[in-house]
From Swiss-Prot:
InterPro entries: UPF0248. This is UPF0248 protein Pisl_1919. It comes from the Archaea. Belongs to the UPF0248 family.
């Protein structure tokens, strides 16, 4: 997964990723790779609204390019619950 984030980052393309978030409606949130400030060995650090958060890779369920191409899906056929 780290390789996917690095490829997107260095290509200059934008992608969106859905992750499990217990406090959110539907149990998921979606963010843009534009929000990623660090790609680590076990997760990413994002900055949203001036606040940084760590999101471990095991919570990420889908990564999709802005064009709609799915780079990673661990959903088993379910559609994302958070909209774009």
């Amino acid at each position: 997964m780290r390789q996917i984030f690095n490829r997107v980052k260095w290509s200059g393309r934008r992608a969106y990723f859905w992750f499990i978030s217990r406090g959110s409606p539907g149990g998921e949130e979606v963010l843009s790779t534009d929000d990623v400030v660090e790609v680590g060995a076990n997760g990413v650090v994002v900055s949203v609204g001036g606040r940084e958060r760590y999101i471990p890779y095991h919570r990420i369920v889908e990564i999709r390019l802005e064009s709609g191409e799915v780079l990673l899906s661990r959903r088993g056929g379910r559609e994302p619950s958070g909209g774009l």
